[in-house]
Amino acid sequence: MKVDELHKNLTDSGYLCTRQFAAQVSASINNKPVAGAFLYGSAGTGKSYLPMVISKITGHKMFFFQCAPGTKEDDLLMKMWPDEKSSSGVKISPGAVYEAAEASQKQKVILVLDEWDKTRPTADAFLLDFFQYGRISIPGKQTTANFKNLVVFFTANDERDFGEAFQRRFPKIDMMPLSPRLIKDALSMT
C-alpha cells in the first residue's frame, strides 16, 4: 500500500497520524523477507491499536499474543490445558505464533506480539530461527510460514534490550504522543 493511501485509510479509520508516520508504517509492511516492525513507545501512544487498524484496512486476519513477565518460547507456540481424558493430563493446542504461521499458508495475516520486552531474552533467539527458516512445530504438528503473507508487529516499552541480530530483522518505529494539532483534529471529530 502506498504512503498516501495508507495515510488516508489510517485517518479515515480514526487513527490520526502524520504522513511521515504513515511512510514509516508503509515501509515496514513492505519490509522483506518478513514484513513488520518494532513499535516502541510509552503507554497510550497507539502501539497495540495500530496493527488492529491495519488489519481492518487490509482485511488481513489478526493473531494477537499478550506477553507477560517471563513469557517463554513454549507460551508463544502452544496453549496447554488440563485434560482428564489424556494420559498426560494435559491437552496441547496451537498458540498464536503457530496459528499465524499456519494461516499464512492460505491468507494474509498480521501477528501482534504485544509487550515483547516482557519476554525472556531467549525468546528473541527462538524467533530469529523462525524468521530465518519459517518452520515451527509443537508436539504432533509442524508447519512453515509463508513470509509473503505474514506481517509481524512487536510492541515494547523499553523494559529490556533486544539482541542486535534480532533488532536488524525489523525497522523500529518510535510511537510518540499525538501532537497538539492532531489532538485538535481528534477533538473536532467527536
Regions found by a protein language model. Name each.
Residues 1-190:
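AAA+ P-loop NTPase catalytic core and its hallmark functional loops
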